[in-house]
Amino acid sequence: MKLLKILLFLLILPTQNLFSSPYLMDPMPNKKPAPDFVLVGIDGKEHSLTELRGKFALINFWATWCTPCKAEMPTLESIHNTLKNDDFTVVGIHVGPGPDAINNYLSLNPVTFPIFIDMDLEYDWGVPGLPTTFLVSPKGEMLYRAVGKRDFS
């Protein structure tokens, strides 16, 4: 019986993406304001959501220990390089161990978008798991959310 359960699991596992959203990101049911924050970036300076007002912000919650997060990073860098201007930015919010782990990872996998360090903001934002990405409007409203690895390129 145990073998049968394992075989069923292995047969179903490859189809899990068939039941996920057909869209890159899912619309938020109500465009509530994104919770504000003041976080320290890997640049050592404090940053807030308020300073991103006036532009679309793709905010990605990730961690260096999260394999899907690391696989997603090059696509975030790609969309950042394609769309970066006064109206759009990508921000990475690292959840978990501090600057040393982040800097070690980024030394081998550099990105040009800002990375902020968080210890508990994911609860305010309703992050169910990593990676989770939000698209925030220029007015600070949460428009879309993607849970799990995506290809943003």
Question: Which role does the model predict for each range below?
Answer:
Residues 7, 18-19:
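Cleavable N-terminal signal peptides
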Residues 53, 61-78:
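Conserved redox-active cysteine motifs that mediate thiol-disulfide chemistry
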Residues 91, 103-139:
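Short, internal strand/loop/helix patches
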Residues 20-49:
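N-terminal "domain-start" segment that seeds a small globular fold
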Residues 138-153:
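Non-catalytic, surface beta->alpha helical segment in thiol-disulfide oxidoreductase systems
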Residues 56-57, 88:
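Alpha/beta-hydrolase fold active-site loops
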Residues 2-9:
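Sec-dependent signal peptide recognition
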